[in-house]
């Protein structure tokens, strides 16, 4: 009888185990439904152009239930561009939000806030410069004109009918007629001899460098008197 009782107990255990497996396979408990897995599936969703995901818990703590949710409008906010998000006032809170609102009121450029609000101190401002004398005249007032503008004259060779003249600058180092004739000889290069006498258009002899006229025409000879008028250049006579 003892063996029979043991067999019955083992058979009852077998039936109980079979019923449990059948219940598990055919269980329709709400814990096994897919609706309860939505909160978990939120972690695996891919949001298109959403910068703040909607997986943030909507339930706040009891002490913050009376306050309006700050991210209520942001969760479903879609921004096509980074600059739209940066220029959206809903993303700013606290001190940054007040600064942003001041920008909108003053119609300032949103991208150059730091440049429009630079404090200018008195040490940064340049003081106006008061000139004692007009610029460029101080050296003349102290030392005078060091080098005057050189005179320009036109030189003609004697007995050259078709001579058009040579442009010549009477520089400051030429102090007398001798040095003037020496410089003229290097330019004209006469075939007869070096230049020794200089005549003006009135055929008067030039004896001093200061007698030269700016823009005047002069005839250079090697010590001979001026040639007849028919042998002189028309450019010199006119």
UniProtKB/Swiss-Prot annotation:
Transmembrane segments: none annotated. PROSITE patterns: DC. Keywords: Cytoplasm, Cytoskeleton. Its main location: cytoplasm. It holds the Pfam family DCX. GO terms for biological process: intracellular signal transduction. SUPFAM superfamilies: Doublecortin (DC), Mss4-like. It comes from the Eukaryota. Human microRNA candidate miR-197 and to a lesser extent miR150 causes the down-regulation of apicortin and thus may be a possible candidate for nucleotide-based antimalarial treatment. The keyword Lyase does not apply. Tamoxifen used to treat breast cancer blocks the interaction between DCX/apicortin and, alpha-tubulin 1 and beta-tubulin resulting in microtubule destabilization. Involved in the stabilization of microtubules. Probably by controlling microtubules stabilization, plays a role in invasion, microneme secretion and parasite growth in host erythrocytes. This is Doublecortin domain-containing protein. The lineage of its organism: Eukaryota, Sar, Alveolata, Apicomplexa, Aconoidasida. The gene is DCX.
